[in-house]
A protein has these predicted regions:
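Hydrophobic alpha-helical transmembrane bundles of multi-pass membrane proteins
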Residues: 1-206
Length: 207
């Protein structure tokens, strides 16, 4: 149930929230980017993300990522447990966190990046940044074992991680070409309101 609430934040929640804030000519593209990034994040999570974040630790590098032992969810069945939870439940719940984190980045580059570019960039970020950091903070890796970290509601893995990626992308892309010359009023604040309500409901599961 909590996983479904987190998924609700990604689609349609954050798609509606961002879509309403963009200009009318970009609303569909923005929502499509959120949906595509969400779907890609879930696929990458199953293929390699979960293994990097929570898979069996392998050697010295185990402090930084979990390894390749559970790629494609290998070795996990309906009897597998993660703590007291069925491991498939844990996979879905953590996959929802990965997906919402990826969707957050879209807002930093909206109206300024090609569809293919955002997919490639976020895909690389999931594999090389999100999953390893999730392992280090939540999966018993370096940060958790050395600093005894407390990550409240994804403050580090989700929010700081996605914010740094989004800010970096915004700096690389630079200002919008029409900034200051063309009105950039939000397309539909009613849609944004609905998205914000869905995000608020989803936060009950997120937290």
């Amino acid at each position: 149930m909590y996983a479904m609430l987190v998924l609700l934040m990604s689609i349609p929640g954050i798609g509606l929230f961002y879509g309403g804030l963009t200009r009318s000519k970009n609303v569909l593209s923005t929502m499509e980017q959120c949906l595509a990034v969400f779907c890609m994040a879930i696929i990458l999570w199953v293929i390699i993300g979960y293994s990097f974040a929570f898979g069996p630790v392998e050697g010295v590098l185990g402090d930084f990522f979990g390894g390749f032992g559970t790629m494609f969810l290998a070795g996990i069945d309906f009897n597998s447990l993660s703590g007291t939870l069925a491991e498939y439940t844990w996979v879905i719940f953590q996959g929802a966190f990965c997906a919402i984190s990826a969707c957050l980045i879209v807002g930093a580059t909206v109206e300024r990046v090609k569809f293919s570019a955002i997919l490639i960039a976020v895909g690389i970020w999931i594999v090389l940044s999100y999953a390893p950091l999730a392992h280090q903070v939540w999966g018993g890796g370096f940060i958790d074992s050395v600093f005894k970290s407390y990550d409240f509601a994804g403050g580090t893995v989700v929010h700081v991680n996605a914010a740094v990626c989004g800010l970096t992308g915004a700096f690389i892309l630079g200002r919008r070409h029409d900034l200051g010359r063309v009105a950039m009023a939000p397309h539909n604040l009613g849609i944004t309101y609905i998205g914000a309500c869905l995000l608020w409901i989803g936060w009950l599961g997120f937290n």
